[in-house]
Amino acid sequence: MKLELIGHDEKYALEQSLLTLFPGEKPVYGTVDKTADTRWARVTLTEEDERVQVTTELGMDGKSAAHSYDYPLSGTEYEKEGQRRHAVGISFFGAAKDLLGISPAWGSLTGVRPAKVALSLIREGGKKRAEKELQELYCVTPARARLAIEAADAGIRAAAELGCEAVWIMDD
């Protein structure tokens, strides 16, 4: 698949999604020609006022879809880099989901431990909100969202019993 990156160089997030959603496709980086290329994605990242916006245009065999995702940037430059990567992944996943008409059970959570994402979401807003965000933002099925919450909760309980700050499988 021809991949054109505009305003960024977030290849890893795209390659993870490509492997999951388009098995057998190999990334080829360059300028997309919508008339000549049969399988392509153009992923554009812009930043303004401490927000990142990523728009993915995706085409395959004459069909196409587009998805935009806007996300606030905050914290250190390292944290912002992760937020940019997150936005690229969600944008690409949204376009692929629309194009293919399917969504994997773990949604857009590729290349990450779902319980780690669930733990972060629990810390930000509790279990109910975390389960809702896993389903709505990451497109995780309800059963898998509950499983991720249960795994994160088990890690929290284990850490409390052991007197640890965090359990290694969920810590950064």
Residue ranges and their predicted role:
Residues 1-2, 18, 24-79, 85-88:
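Short, well-ordered secondary-structure micro-motifs within conserved domains or adaptor modules
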Residues 2-4, 167:
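A structural signal for isolated positions on well-ordered beta-strands in alpha/beta enzyme cores
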Residues 4, 78, 82, 104, ...:
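Short, charged/polar micro-motifs that form catalytic or ligand-binding hotspots
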Residues 87-148:
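A short N-terminal interaction module
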Residues 108, 112-119, 153-172:
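N-terminal pre-triad scaffold of radical SAM enzymes
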